Each structure stands twice: as C-alpha cells, then as structure tokens.
Amino acid sequence: MRQKMILALALGGMLSAQAQHVQESNFCSPFDFPILLSANFGELRPNHFHNGLDIKTQGVTGKPIHCIADGYVSRVAVLHGGYGQAIYVTHPNGLTSVYGHVISFAKNIQACVRQYQYAHETFVCDLKFQPGQFPVKKGDIIALSGNEGASAGPHLHLELRRTETGEYIDPMPYFKHLLKDSKAPVGSLIGIYPIQGKGVVNGVSHKKLLAIGNLKQPVHAWGEIYTGISAKDYMDGTSNFYGVHSVTLYVDSVQVFNSTTDKVLPDENRMINGFTDYEELTRTRRLIMRSYKFPGNRLRLLHANENRGAVTINEERDYHFRYVLEDNFGNRRTYQFIVKGKRQDIPEYKPEANEMLYWNRTNVIQKPGMELVVPRYYVYEDVPLRTDMRGDSSLIAFDYILDAGRTPIHSYCDLSIGLRHMPVADTTKYYIVQKAGKWRSSMGGKYANGWIKTRVRSLGTFSVDVDTIAPQITPIGQGGWRTSRNIRFRIKDMESGIGSYKVYIDGKFVLFGLKKGILVIQDPENVKKGVPHKLEVTVTDQCGNMTRKEYKF
C-alpha cells in the first residue's frame, strides 16, 4: 500500500511539474489562422513513431510560420528526403522547436543557407549557429510552409525536443488549447497471441484476430498468452485519423499493460517494430499495438506487469479483459471481452531454422565467404534464422540466404561477403545487393582485402554485383527553358543508385534540388531570361560511374 502511495505521489509530482512547464512556456501558434492537425505525436508509422504534430496549411504552401517562443535559430537542415528543409529554434526553457517541410526560410537565414550552398556547390547542408547569430522573438516569421522532402501534401511538421538529449516530446499539451476534440478513440481489431511453446489459443499456436464487432465470439486458451489492439483516434473539424495517446489493458480488473506516447528518444524510434505486430503490418498493412513487451525491447513508453504483459491462463474459468483507450483530451472508450480458460495441449515449439539470433548477446553468423554481425538488443526476442548459400564457382559471389521471416532488425548490422571472381579490376564498382525474385536493391559497400563490406538493417538474400553502367539523364520540357526558366531533369540509376549531381549554366554552378528522381532548379531568377545559355549536368552513381551532358537553350 505504501509503495502504491509513493508511486501515486511521484506521478502526481511529475504531472504537476509538466503542467507547470507547459503553463510557463506559453507557446503561441505557429500560424495566424485556426489550426487543424493531419497527424499527432506518437502516431504509428513504419519503423518509427511520428515525432511531432502535422499542422494543415489549408491545402497550399507559402503560409508564414511564426516562431512559437523567444530563442535563437540553432540549426538549419536541407535534405532531399526527410523533413526537406527544416529550421530549429532553441528556447531558454530547455526545449528546441523544429519546423519541417518548409519551402523557404526568413530572408537573412535563407541568404546564409544559399551562401553556403553556392560556396560548397551542394544542395544538401546542415548548418549550426551560435546564440547571437540569429536571435528570434515569439511571433517572428521564421519560414514559409511547404511540401518539401518526404511529404505527401502541404503542411507544417512541428516538433518539440529536449535540447540536451534530443528526446522528442509530445507538443500537444502546449497547443491543445488551440484545438477541439470531443471524439474518443475507436478500436477495430483485437489480437490474441499464444506464446509459442508456452500457450495455445483455440487449439493452435497462431494468433487469433477478432473484429471489434465480434468480441462475443468464444475464444479458448491455455498457458501464456498476450493481446493487442488496433485503434485510431479522431478530432473535431477533420476527417483525419490519429494515433491513440494511451492504451491500458486490465485483466480481471488488474492492470497488466499500458502504453502512453508522450516522449521518445531517437534511438527508440525503431523499437516501434517490437511494439506493433510487425508481421501483420508487413503482410496486411494493419497496425496492431501489442500489449506485451519483448525482453529486448527497451522502449520506455511501454509499462508492463512482471510478466511483461503476458497473461497466464491456468484455470478453467472466464478471464475478463478490458481495454481503455484515451486521447490527450481525456476522451475515453472501453472494450471488453472474455477469454475462456480451457485445458488443451500446448504444441512444442520447433522452429524451422539452423541458427538463432539471441536478443541479449552479439550474434556472429558465418558461412564460407560471408559474415553477419547482429549486436545485442538488435532483435527484440530470440529469433530463428534460416541460413543457406547458393550458386556456383563462376559467380562473383554466392547468394547468401539470411531468412528470419518477417522479423524487424533494430539498426544497422555489419555484413561482409567475399569475392570469388573479379571480372572488373576497379574495386569501387562492386556493391552488395539484396534481392527477392525480380526485385533488387543496392546495399552499397566498400572493398577491403577481397571482401565487400556494408551495413544492413533488414534480412533476406544477399550477394555481390558489379556496376559499370552510368546513370541516365533526361531533360524535361527543354523547349520552354529559355522563357520559363523551369529547368528540370529526370535522373535514374538502375544499379547502385544515384550518388551525386551538379549543374552549371554558362560555367557557373546553379543550385538544383532532387525530389522523386526529378532535378529542379531552385533559383530560376538567377538565369537571365530570353538569351541563349549553355548548361552542363553531371550525375554520378554510388560506384563512381558518371554521365555528363550539355544542353543549349
């Protein structure tokens, strides 16, 4: 009882401190119009949680973005993917706000970025600034909203991070007064999972999925099981759906599991693959949140009982399960179902594999001419691994099969494959390829002492290939370049992938961005209209093969 009281007091203190911090921060809206969200913090995504709020920009780009509080611009990043263009503002309260997918920065910052890009002849850049360089006040316009990088439509991606650790924290408590939400989360599916070799559901060792509308369907289990739920949240004023902030599971009125998405460290992002049913996601695209914590999953937002969320069914009686779903605004929905304890045989677990990946140790998997190193905690539970090698002595390298089924790997693992033959003397032309049927994808790689070495974070079939084919360059709308100055190229490489590119007009470097394989001029106003020009474009792939073309317009 005393421990429960101490825990309650501690939680109360933490919540009070957080509420005080929110009140003291007093952030303003980044926009001068009423805001709606297209995504919330913690929304489940492939391989990561959504780390901020996506704010709608009324379907257009170019909306002025206001700094949410006093501070200074500490960083500006320009990428082809990801956030595209992002601006970071460090605040005196220990937080940094991040504004992603912007189309441009405030004039003084934009000029600094452009100066760097032209001086270094590069589009991609990551610039850090000191406190006195670009101070900003609450409400200052720091950028214009856009659709840059990996964005599916115009919006602002707004993050809050702890300045010292880089930890992502949920911005919703700071901005919920600007939003309206009277809608409770909605579940769609319940999963009941037997732990293989220790439990059984309806006579088999496979999961049982129940639609929310079919929860009265009889389910019989014995031994150790756990459950999961698929659910979405909704808000007023939009048709979008969002991630569920808090999921709590009770069994016979005792809490056995809770997940609350209020903070995530960068290294925890891919641990989402141990929280969700990764096999179901990759096979059907359905997102089911497990109410179970694998032994190797260190994700802090998961809170489980001493059995990591597992429930032992060892009596022939009804076990009462109850899910409580809650959003940031206190809207709550409950789902209840019964699992009937029924004594039944539990099949022995016999994985069809010749190797194992253990979650709590470094795994070194070797075959003749191949080595894979999977560090500790890079799988979330012990995983069967089927290994094999195929091919004949005439190949550059054997095909190596590293089959762990639909199992996620936490981060990059070292993979080395030895060369059996070198049809091309230039060692920079070799790369490791992952393949499945007709699908092939370059994993990159560097040559060292007869081996090609790279890093991979998914398993499958790997080999070595050679790339001596240069990239392709195709002009788009060349006939209108002189008048429109909308200069674009389609570039692609079928082997190792695009490595770099540069464009010069009349002998001077011109800035181009790359999105979805299209090179697009960034400063068309720098190209004089209506006069002849000579353009030179070079594209180099990851193995150093280069294509150079000249155009007159």
Protein language model regions, located:
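Surface-exposed, glycine-biased beta-strand/turn segments
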Residues: 19-97, 103-105, 122-132, 137-138, ...
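Exoplasmic/lumenal beta-rich domain surfaces
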Residues: 96-131, 206-216, 243, 250-311, ...
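Short edge beta-strand/loop segments characteristic of extracellular beta-sandwich folds
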Residues: 228-232, 416-420, 486-494
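Conserved structural position at the C-terminal beta-strand
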Residues: 231, 325, 537-539
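Surface-exposed, short loops/turns at beta-strand junctions within beta-sandwich domains
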Residues: 312-318, 456-458, 524-532
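Short, solvent-exposed loop/turn segments at the edges of extracellular beta-sandwich modules
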Residues: 326-331, 540-545
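Proteolytic processing hotspots in large secreted/extracellular or virion-associated proteins
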Residues: 346-359, 385-431
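Proteolytic-maturation and junctional protease-sensitive modules
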Residues: 406-460, 500-502, 509-510
